Regions:
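Non-core capping and flanking segments associated with repeat-based/extracellular domains
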Residues: 1-274
């Protein structure tokens, strides 16, 4: 049983029995409150597929869904708490993350992270868009909150100008030992981080023995992007292919020469630029 709603207001009655047989719920362009959306989801015990997009009025998403397998969230929110032990796929995107990058968590001495990476440790597919600057201000750099033992597909959006984001991405990748496919979107420069750190030293211990394919879209030919790809090629012995979507304004032939000259630990690794 599925339910798809858009352009609506989610406001529950005082007595709400829930949707006991609902398995798929898609909500788009809607408004609600923290309590109403939490109660709605809590009273859908069979829910396996949830998509929430373009919403307002929700600051903290509390999702308790014991049978949830696929979660897509795209909207303005400040915190998300997950209790979904069977989750296999999570796509989390928010343009609002950058606006609270320096807000600390009360009574949390570990850092600033409100994105519950620990509760995502068992999933196979993970996409994080809009969170890297946010995560890089917290504890992910020094102490990654989870080891993604089952993660096979990883989607990341990184601003390579901001070296803290790059270091955070390396930290996350280092804790995905069975990763097979990596997809990266190179985001444009927003506000450059003043505390620039070279990635040369930190990624030396990163090892991804099972990575087979990697891709990067919106590649601009920046030295930071090339350096990241160089590190990737140096720690992936099973790598077969790196696909790059060119979006740069630099001399393409010069950048291609750099890319093709990068040493590769995998003899099968090919670099394809389109």
């Amino acid at each position: 049983m599925s339910l798809r709603l858009k352009n609506c207001i989610i406001s529950l009655p005082r007595v709400f029995q829930g949707f006991k047989r609902l398995t798929v719920l898609f909500l788009k362009r809607f408004s609600s409150t923290d309590r109403d959306i939490q109660n709605l989801l809590s009273f859908c015990p069979e829910l396996t597929n949830l998509r929430l997009s373009s919403f307002e009025g929700i600051n903290c998403l509390n999702i308790q869904a014991p049978k949830l397998e696929s979660l897509h969230v795209d909207g303005d929110f400040e915190e998300i708490n997950l209790d979904a032990p069977n989750l296999h796929e999570a796509i989390l995107s928010t343009p609002k993350a950058k606006s609270y990058q320096s807000v600390s968590v009360a009574h949390d001495k570990e850092g600033y992270v409100k994105l519950p990476l620990g509760s995502l440790s068992e999933i196979k597919t993970l996409a994080i868009f809009g969170f890297m600057k946010y995560l890089s201000k917290g504890c992910v750099l020094m102490k990654p909150p989870a080891v993604f033992t089952r993660l096979e597909n990883f989607y990341l959006a990184i601003c390579f100008w901001d070296q803290r984001q790059v270091l955070t991405a390396c930290s996350l990748l280092q804790n995905a030992p069975n990763l097979k496919k990596l997809h990266i979107r190179s985001d444009p420069l927003s506000t450059r981080d003043q505390d620039q750190v070279s990635i040369q030293g930190l990624t030396l211990e990163m090892q991804m023995d099972h990575l087979i394919t990697a891709s990067m879209i919106f590649f601009k030919g920046l030295d930071y992007e090339v350096d990241f790809l160089a590190k990737l090629l140096s720690c992936t012995p099973a790598l077969e292919e790196v696909k790059i979507e060119w979006m740069g304004e630099m001399d393409r032939s010069m950048v291609l020469t750099k890319l093709l000259a990068l040493p590769r630990v995998s003899p099968r690794a090919k670099i394809i630029v389109t």
